[in-house]
Amino acid sequence: MSLDLNSATGMFLGLAIGDAMGSPIEFEKPRPRDNYIRRYQSGGFHSVSKGEFTDDTSMALAMADALIESQKTNGYPFDGHMIMNNFLDWRYNGKFSPREKCFDVGLTVNGALWKYKEDKTTPFTGCTHYKSAGNGGLMRLAPVLIVAKNKAEAIYLARESTRLTHGAEEALMYSEIFAEEVWDGCILPQYVDYRHPLDIDRDDVSSGGYVKETFQAAW
């Protein structure tokens, strides 16, 4: 996105902070407007400590590390095998995790990593069944959006990075849409109060792992 260092850092920190603030209330129903989360909490499904991030940030860190190494080695940031090997290092060795072990992994991601661990012929091992359209690929998009040089590349990298672990067309589509919307938002000359056509009433927003629900909640 040709971002300066401060902007790129802000995007990545925003991912990690949102992850850490949201993880204690993961899978809960929407809260009343006067009961928003305004500071770090502990607890939740994974018994996180205050400020502790989860698999979403860990996988984004793993991807960012691979993008940097691929740029140095290959002259181009995206290398699916490098990314997947980093994902394996996180899953089985705890690298990139705040606890030095993997304590949170989705079923779709876990299946894709196990498949790649057994056969590294291709890095794109995400399940293509429509019921596997989880949000894992969408949640870790920041690194590829930072390195993309234009909107077309941002959309392409969003799809390819998602396809590593999530092959369902719906999961790929929402990553592409999100990449395009973020890119368009970042190149606007000033802040725009933008409401996406997919906006729904906040009481109807769900907080499960389905990619469409996550997209709607974020937007």
Language model segments and positions:
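Structured, active/binding-site neighborhoods that engage oxygen-rich ligands
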Residues: M1-W219
